[in-house]
């Protein structure tokens, strides 16, 4: 087995799927670690092409020889909730002004999508996490 490469940095970004370009915020974040920005952009765009339209969080591990690896996560729960509810943004005052409603089935669908990134052991637990996020955005969960 090849010797382990020394990690010099871990960068976490949220980028539109298939739309990474060297402009800020990507360029400066990668540039200060000496990563080839265009190489990352091409690899990220190829990996996320199927999910166009979503914001995809990515964790980039930078090694001392300036090479990198990256792991894409599932879209943020808030983004999935807004898309399912059909709203542009959550409520400014979530506990007094409600902006939309979600059914329990929609919450379960989002929970199953997010399951691998959530700190939950069961789908019910994941659904409770998603429902809590929705409530804090001023979106009512029915059922």
From Swiss-Prot:
Record keyword Kinase present: no
One Gene Ontology molecular-function label: structural constituent of ribosome
Superkingdom assignment: Bacteria
InterPro entries per UniProt: Ribosomal_uL11, Ribosomal_uL11_bac-typ, Ribosomal_uL11_C, Ribosomal_uL11_C_sf, Ribosomal_uL11_CS, Ribosomal_uL11_N, Ribosomal_uL11_N_sf
GO-annotated cellular components: cytosolic large ribosomal subunit
PTM text: One or more lysine residues are methylated.
Gene3D superfamilies hit by this protein: Ribosomal protein L11, C-terminal domain (1.10.10.250), Ribosomal protein L11/L12, N-terminal domain (3.30.1550.10)
UniProt record, GO biological process: translation
Annotated keywords: Methylation, Ribonucleoprotein, Ribosomal protein, RNA-binding, rRNA-binding
SUPFAM superfamilies on file: Ribosomal L11/L12e N-terminal domain (SSF54747), Ribosomal protein L11, C-terminal domain (SSF46906)
Quaternary structure and partners: Part of the ribosomal stalk of the 50S ribosomal subunit. Interacts with L10 and the large rRNA to form the base of the stalk. L10 forms an elongated spine to which L12 dimers bind in a sequential fashion forming a multimeric L10(L12)X complex.
Family according to the record: Belongs to the universal ribosomal protein uL11 family.
Function: Forms part of the ribosomal stalk which helps the ribosome interact with GTP-bound translation factors.
Name used for this protein in its record: Large ribosomal subunit protein uL11
Organism encoding this protein: Arthrobacter sp. (strain FB24)
């Amino acid at each position: 087995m090849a010797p382990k490469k020394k990690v010099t940095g871990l960068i976490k970004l949220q980028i539109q799927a298939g739309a990474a370009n060297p402009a800020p915020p990507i360029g400066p974040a990668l540039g200060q670690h000496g990563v080839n920005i265009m190489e990352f952009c091409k690899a990220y765009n190829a990996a996320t092409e199927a999910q166009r339209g979503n914001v995809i969080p990515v964790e980039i591990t930078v090694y001392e020889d300036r090479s990198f690896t990256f792991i894409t996560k599932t879209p943020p729960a808030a983004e999935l909730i807004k898309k399912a509810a059909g709203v542009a943004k959550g409520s400014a005052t979530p506990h007094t002004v409600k902006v939309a409603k979600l059914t329990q089935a929609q919450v379960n669908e989002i929970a199953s999508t997010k399951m691998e990134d959530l700190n939950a052991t069961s789908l019910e637990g994941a659904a409770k996490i998603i429902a809590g996020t929705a409530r804090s955005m001023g979106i009512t969960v029915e059922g």
